[in-house]
Amino acid sequence: MDGFIGDTTALLARTPELLRTLLIGLPQAWTDTPDTADGWRPRDVVGHLITGEQTDWMVRTRRILEHGTSVAFDRFERFAMLERDAGVPLDELVERFARLRNANLAALRELITDADLERRGLHPSLGEVSLRELLATWAVHDLDHIGQIYAGLAGSHDAEVGPWREYLGILLRREDPAAVAG
């Protein structure tokens, strides 16, 4: 198997345990703050990751393998979690995500080979994309949202850090993405 597939799935396999370690059992006061003023709380991010597991990554992988570029991917409902997951405890969302991710990675390992990586699909707004690009995006998408979760957790104590705020880039970037800690 291409090192790319093994390396990418190894990273993807770590996300459920990272989320368990980071979020399960934390008080709601830590998890109710969005990463930016109009951003997502950690629970929203986990819900968004669940949506990806249900309707995006493996669905698009199968679409590439079965149809190539002849059938475009469905659009991704980025905000589906807001209504679907209202009132669901965060710990339950983390466990739901873990089950879905583990099942998807098991299916992925059975489904693709190195030879499939350059096969192409059709994204509704980006045009043609390769399976390799889709899988790389899946992994980087995790990293992007893990950073978002950390920013939300840090934001829950924004006021409490007092004058040290000017040294904490994770807090400064909540208001100005280009900010660098002092």
Region spans (language model):
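Short, contiguous, pocket-lining structural segments
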Residues: 4-14, 37, 96, 126, ...
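Acidic/histidine-rich alpha-helical segments that form the ligand environment
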Residues: 15, 78-119, 129, 133-141, ...
